[in-house]
UniProtKB/Swiss-Prot annotation:
NCBIfam families: rplN_bact
Name of the protein this chain belongs to: Large ribosomal subunit protein uL14
SMART domains per UniProt: Ribosomal_L14
High-level lineage: Bacteria, Bacillati, Actinomycetota, Actinomycetes, Propionibacteriales
Native source species: Nocardioides sp. (strain ATCC BAA-499 / JS614)
Quaternary structure and partners: Part of the 50S ribosomal subunit. Forms a cluster with proteins L3 and L19. In the 70S ribosome, L14 and L19 interact and together make contacts with the 16S rRNA in bridges B5 and B8.
PANTHER family, per database record: 50S/60S RIBOSOMAL PROTEIN L14/L23, LARGE RIBOSOMAL SUBUNIT PROTEIN UL14M
Family under the similarity heading: Belongs to the universal ribosomal protein uL14 family.
Length: 122
């Protein structure tokens, strides 16, 4: 569960290393974001020469959460860290590579490009 002020690792090669959630998109009173939800975030840590710089405001989709998520078959999925992938305005990933596994929930939310770039879908 990601909320305002949550810090997430960036799981792509845009140059950002860490982002801070400033808004969960999807309704005026929405408090939490899970796997597959889009957030507005600011870049807190970035490498020199990357596509994004520290202080940039970006949209990102959550791909891993520490809080477990219940699947329709009764199983649960959880990860060791909170991570997100930075998006362009049209919803496509801004980077060209994805690092680490991503949740299967992204497929239902129509993030097929991220699914195809990810090394593993759990």
């Amino acid at each position: 569960m990601i909320q305002q002020e949550s810090r997430l690792k960036v799981a792509d090669n845009t140059g950002a290393k860490e982002i801070l959630c400033i808004r969960v998109l999807g309704g005026s009173g929405r408090r939490y974001a899970g796997i597959g939800d889009v957030i507005v975030a600011t870049v807190k840590d970035a490498i020199p020469g990357g596509n994004v710089k520290k202080g940039d405001v970006v949209k990102a989709v959550v791909v891993r959460t520490v809080k477990e998520r219940r699947r329709p078959d009764g199983s649960y999925i959880r990860f060791d860290e909170n991570a997100a992938v930075i998006l362009k305005n049209d919803g496509e990933p801004r980077g060209t590579r994805i690092f680490g596994p991503v949740g299967r929930e992204l497929r239902e939310k129509k993030f097929m490009k991220i699914i195809s770039l990810a090394p593993e879908v759990l």
